[in-house]
């Protein structure tokens, strides 16, 4: 092959059985350093863990609000009952209207 093929980063040779050989270019060898690569991994891991902690915090806040909504709606009934009766206002009005209709029919 020619000199231009080896400077481009790959060279192929069909005669000796290899089709594609990769050679590092000058740009990739200057950028690829082990300490720089390791610091990039630390940055990505720290960003991931920060986002994970933030999402966990949002989930906890949402669950607390949901728990407060559920507990406030179940602990305070709209119409407190007298003498242990479990009738709602609608049921009481319905019963009283049926009684008045029955008394009008009977008289």
Swiss-Prot record:
Membrane topology per record: Single-pass membrane protein
InterPro entries documented for this protein: SERTM
Transmembrane segments annotated in the record for this chain: 43-63
Domain of life: Eukaryota
Subcellular localization(s) per the UniProt record: Membrane
GO-annotated cellular components: intracellular membrane-bounded organelle; membrane
Pfam families assigned to the protein according to its UniProt record, in alphabetical order: SRTM1 (PF15872)
Principal place of residence: membrane
UniProt cross-references to PANTHER family, sorted A to Z: SERINE-RICH AND TRANSMEMBRANE DOMAIN-CONTAINING PROTEIN 1
Protein name: Serine-rich and transmembrane domain-containing protein 1
Organism: Mus musculus (Mouse)
Gene name of the record: Sertm1
